[in-house]
């Protein structure tokens, strides 16, 4: 019954799926040597719009993926305990502002670098998630396709943010050095429930961070238009 309900809730997403696969314009912009450039052929404003579009779609699909996973694999009592499962979000230690007042006070430069840190911190965990989902019995193709799509689009978003940093700040790419050892270490043969709760935490945390990426980028866009009206 839970599987049927989850599939019904996801039917509208199936209709939207071809659009999601084609609507987002690629953010890659490389020179003849294959190195990311300043993208002289596209304006800073249009590039920022494309980056925001990618972030919006990534958040939307991550929300759908988390809901689908929850419906299919998480009993309701455990849904209430997901924050007590002993798996903190992997980006918890990153120096990224969380409150509205903190976000309002940071510079455009730090807004961009905060987005880049979040994006880079999630690339490997999402690849890891795709491998762990194969352990599940009856995992729907819809969930596998969504996680794969998000993983690929996140790498595209990274490229777009890097080019945006080059354009707006005239800076080179920075790489986030963050260890996911606490999340990915193999504790022998964990129970299936432990796998499920760990992956559920991963999806929930990514959904939250994907929303934060979108918020930060939209604040940056607002500042470009009218600094005093941004809240």
Swiss-Prot record:
Organ and tissue specificity: Pituitary gland.
Single Gene Ontology MF annotation: growth hormone receptor binding
Database matches in SUPFAM superfamilies: 4-helical cytokines
Keywords: Disulfide bond, Glycoprotein, Hormone, Secreted, Signal
Places the protein is found: Secreted
Pfam families for the chain: Hormone_1
GO cellular component: extracellular space
InterPro entries in the record: 4_helix_cytokine-like_core, Somatotropin/Prolactin, Somatotropin_CS
Name by which UniProt lists this protein: Somatolactin-1
